[in-house]
């Protein structure tokens, strides 16, 4: 399995290559202007055709209908000659790259499109374009392609194809063989296959937007492979719809998001495995009702050539030479550069050992620890400050003046969900988050991914979410401090209530859990639930514990916190200040039995002198030992250390003779 570093190196090369083939902002703006202008002009052509078919109307009534055309479009769509215009191909899928910017639109007709309708739209379209913009466009008709070709006259040069089609053409083919009732086709009907291809392209665009647009790195890999199809003739037959299906299946079947380099390698692995070869699984077309192979148009030789080329590309990628597949210069390594080179021979050629660092190099600033520490700190800060901009700042730098809108706010009060949107080049992007700031950041990441810019802003989102959590915790801390002050004043000798509303754990002054520390001092305590108040999102529990005849209460948002609060109140009342010495309770270690008991008793009597009885306390008792803890050694629960106190020697220590006991063989099992 390859290391993550090698995948990161592939990601760097793929993203640099992607930045070179991605269209410039000027080209994207020109595409957006041209497509929007033609779409609006075709809408006016549709209105003009409807007015012509209905006959001459009064001027006032005509002007009113022109103004209400947009509002009544959905109602009158069934009776319109031109039902609508939709984007297909690279424009709808967002796969435009430099030197490969084929723009396509589909003009949907109510009836089967004819040459007469094509000429009518072609003649009226330039008139409507002149009303919308001052730019000059060349409009031509192509009857063989059932389309209208539109070209702009300034740089960058763009070509837009508007294909006429109708859903009646496909409905007619799907009728059963027994049905002979068919409408008579007009004599100047456009090419049926071209119209069917336009309908298929419309289905492909809808499928791509639903399945492939949401996959991470899928659009980037498709742009890289489209550039590969343009550069290498072997890959040219795979360009188009089959390539999109392969990428979606390869990347979408992974159980986790993939980076650009790893996603490209996964696609190459699928192609190199032989899925294109005869006898393989083939490539099912999901946009056709009948089982259809999307690779049926390719020859066997073409499939073998593509498989061989994919295997060679995968081999180069495995050896860290992906730059050869992308036809680019290798990028410098991201590893830190070593200052001293190690060679086998010295300058004179007589030495056989590696050169060491000269002694003079170590007499510089390294002798001063302050200067060395400052230099190391500067390196750390520089490495962390490589990219100080988050996704929102980066997008604002690329596209200034974007307007973010709040679409909705849902969820409960304690966990709201905000949905923000932004419109970029006619495309609306939406994202949600626990706050408006996070939702805007999510939207910015989506836009940057769609534009093809590298997005490594997961850390920014996590930082924002952590900041929001810290704000909430700071608010809760202020509440807890006030409540603790109030409860401290109302504490009595018989009962005490402590409420803590902090998000973090409750600890004593020694850094321990209050329940554990109180249990060490007084065993067998029982905590009782006194009350439970509040709604589902703001509960308040009160727990009570009785210690030495006194009752202490604690409150909190859950039983665990309330229990810890009650234990903390008991510790502060009974085991802190002047009451600590009186309530301190020493543990009694049970005496050993048999030979061990006799030996220990004799040793103790010998040390302490005549007339003394055996010790009733543990072997190690000192003033510095923590109450309730047994010093490690013989008789301890785990016995991982020698017979000595855990934190230094106590003032009073009994020395015991070393006792040896016979050991019995213990079976050992080995699994290696």
Swiss-Prot record:
Biased composition (Basic and acidic residues): 357-371, 467-476
Any Pfam family: DZF_C
Family annotation (InterPro entries): dsRBD_dom (IPR014720), DZF_dom (IPR006561), DZF_dom_C (IPR049402), DZF_dom_N (IPR049401), NT_sf (IPR043519), STRBP_DSRM_1 (IPR044472)
Low complexity compositional bias, start-end: 477-497
Modified residues (Asymmetric dimethylarginine): 612, 617
Residue ranges occupied by any DRBM domain in the UniProt entry: 387-453, 510-576
Tissue: Isoform 2 is expressed in spermatocytes (at protein level). Expressed in testis, thymus, ovary, liver, kidney, heart, spleen and brain. Expressed in cortex, dentate gyrus and Purkinje cell layer and granule cells of the cerebellum.
Keyword Cell inner membrane recorded: no
Gene Ontology BP annotations: cell motility; mechanosensory behavior; spermatid development
GO molecular function: double-stranded RNA binding; microtubule binding; single-stranded RNA binding; tubulin binding
Function: Involved in spermatogenesis and sperm function. Plays a role in regulation of cell growth. Binds to double-stranded DNA and RNA. Binds most efficiently to poly(I:C) RNA than to poly(dI:dC) DNA. Also binds to single-stranded poly(G) RNA. Binds non-specifically to the mRNA PRM1 3'-UTR and adenovirus VA RNA.
Protein name, as recorded: Spermatid perinuclear RNA-binding protein
Species name: Mus musculus
Record lineage: Eukaryota, Metazoa, Chordata, Craniata, Vertebrata
Originating gene: Strbp
